[in-house]
From Swiss-Prot, chains A, B:
Family assignment from sequence similarity: Belongs to the class-II aminoacyl-tRNA synthetase family.
Molecular function per GO: asparagine-tRNA ligase activity; ATP binding; nucleic acid binding
Protein name: Asparagine--tRNA ligase
Organism: Azobacteroides pseudotrichonymphae genomovar. CFP2
CDD domains tied to this protein: AsxRS_core, EcAsnRS_like_N
Amino acid sequence: MKMKRARIVDLLSTPDFNRKVCVKGWVRTRRGNKNISFIELNDGSTVHGIQIVVNVVKLGEDSLKSITTGACIAINGLLVKSKGEGQKVEIQADEIEIYGIADPSVYPLQKKWHSLEFLREIAYLRPRTNTFGCILRIRHHLAYAIHKYFNKQGFFYFHTPIITSSDAEGAGSMFQITDLDIANCPKTKDGEVDYTRDFFGCSTNLTVSGQLEGELGALALGGIYTFGPIFRAEKSNTPRHLAEFWMIEPEIAFYDINDNMDLAEDFLKYIISYAMKYCKDDIEFLNNTYNNELIEHLNFVLSNRFVRLAYSEGIRILEQSNEEFEFPIYWGIDLQSEHERYLVEKYFKCPVIMTNYPKDIKSFYMKQNDDGRTVRGMDVLFPRIGEIIGGSERESDHQKLLKRIKELNMSMDNLWWYLDTRRFGTAPHSGFGLGFERLVLFVTGMQNIRDVIPFPRTPKNAEF
Amino acid sequence: MKMKRARIVDLLSTPDFNRKVCVKGWVRTRRGNKNISFIELNDGSTVHGIQIVVNVVKLGEDSLKSITTGACIAINGLLVKSKGEGQKVEIQADEIEIYGIADPSVYPLQKKWHSLEFLREIAYLRPRTNTFGCILRIRHHLAYAIHKYFNKQGFFYFHTPIITSSDAEGAGSMFQITDLDIANCPKTKDGEVDYTRDFFGCSTNLTVSGQLEGELGALALGGIYTFGPIFRAEKSNTPRHLAEFWMIEPEIAFYDINDNMDLAEDFLKYIISYAMKYCKDDIEFLNNTYNNELIEHLNFVLSNRFVRLAYSEGIRILEQSNEEFEFPIYWGIDLQSEHERYLVEKYFKCPVIMTNYPKDIKSFYMKQNDDGRTVRGMDVLFPRIGEIIGGSERESDHQKLLKRIKELNMSMDNLWWYLDTRRFGTAPHSGFGLGFERLVLFVTGMQNIRDVIPFPRTPKNAEF
């Protein structure tokens, strides 16, 4: 078929009827009788299919036999206003070409309700469903909005390394990378693995955060952001954990904790409103199919100013509440999800940015307050999912940073370069991390993080 | 300093003089006498510094002592038209705050010429140099242009997995990933590594290409693209090889090889012209400092239509040329860089897209031509660097694909899901891969691929 293919999303919104068009896509359903057949065709450009009307007598019954759910076809026909209900336009087929059949006796995606659990097992096919089409389009638009936002701010996309010889947080389970034959590792005289013979000449891991390298970028280019894959070798089989996920980490020179909070709020509101504008149909589909509070939650974030709340004040509010919590409340605890949700959903009824955490529950690199016991960390707390962003102003004073590292008995052998940034032209700076899948969960309203990434990596699963 | 910080790139182009401004950045140089001091300040937003004029008597000589190359400072002052040559505006300082000193006796980046080799050793500091500032800003704008282009085409950013249990090309050196204790691996009764006890329950590697998973996306969403890190465990210590690099792989349903070639040409022209527009100063700096043919090369690509050239015709031209080549020419060879450059730089004098390669030098998944000996692969050949893009129309026929796999004695145990796309609703489709660093090399005019990524990973080097 030589006519230029039109995307269905464009045809559904065109005011320009009564013209010949060509569409190509996958059959969702076919129904009808011996005279007329209706095909719902989807090409992935939108959750909505376009209706193809086929004159069975004219095109021949035989040509329709293999047009079953999942088959791939091309249609030339006339685009007309639809007489039927439920759609605005339809195509009267002149010509049909079959690219690929999908034998109903073996094709797993038939026209019926498939559970999300079942679809997870056939992750290689699930992008062809309406649900995952919606999720993946939203995922795209969120990613695009993130680049657009930071580009507009004048921040530069900075590729921090995936393979690393240092551990960004002084903790965390990491995957090891090697090109040694692990069945038969070369050993040193002491019986240790001889890493001088490994590809990089040392032991290497998959990164758990790009922040420390990101700081190097910020202290040179002013403002940077990362957007790349991050890995955790935690054997947590939960709806909230992935071994491989994507993370966004802006880092900005000359930003203090207040600038950082303002940025986080503005950023989240921008990307969520972008998604609501450009993924309207997809969000509506998910709202109506899975989670009828979804749009409400999104508007909740957009229409409220995020409350700034010191940790100590948060503890006071929780202590004085009459709520029964599973975990006890006292100054020094790491807040649990139940506490965060109480503050956001019941007490303030708006997103909360909590700051000035006890230093003992936060990372070594956070800027120390003068009180000697708190640091300028910040967590952005959302309804339903709790923490969506974690960040801080960074300790820019070389001596204070060294002292804290000593207190924590950390080895900084592999991080001398990080400390050097505080020796050479140090500057106040801040940043935060946003787990991309956490964001996609929030904007799609899905419950399981394995449903918002194309090919989830979890314990015992690296398929496709 | 409570005044809002202005970015130097904005001040250098403002028509709005004689107002108080605040700038923050790193000192490139300071010179002057006992009455007046000139500081060149850079904040990473542009390659150009802004000149700060300091009345030494007014601000006190002592306050200036630690303002040496690399120090980080904040300035409040009056933005005025410059009387000096070489700059349009300058700032008359009212107030200076020192954020961080950079002791000249230890700070490695002094005001002198540093070789690229030396800067590679201090990769953690080199973003602070003019050269790497330019490269990294260009890198950002190219990445942004890529997202912008595909978004406009209606293609969706699709995250293919980094950790994989399959080898995309049936070849290639891969890094292994594990959370086993490799010094003491669990073994099966047969003495093999017991991968059932590894994190994913099987042997896993870092991906060498997202293409195969990308095809799953394209055959559901219509058009997708990937942009993520790719890994090769090849011990090649050359200016063209990295163990970790970034790759862009669009994959589009219903595109044939001609659509694919048109897309590749339009795409490359778009992103290169975007860079020339948004990175004008940076490209000029690199042109004038390292490679005075850079801008010429970029214009060469923009102003010429890319020639479409069948491999067989290319061989004929090479055979009939009077050029002396190191490697012999005959039908069936994989072209060498010298051949590609002859065709591009001497014969056609324009970029070339070569197609219809002998099947034996290309991958199993390329669409087979009717002649039984060629496939619909395509390489885009550029001046100076040779192949910048490699792609193909994919074999969409299940039987032909199976037959080819058998011919090649490939094991497809881990790729049943890939074959399934040809069983269920298969469609003609095409795609290509662009090595991002190869592109950045071309647009920056740099010679060594280690100089166009922030933290290069190469044999024996995973530092920072």
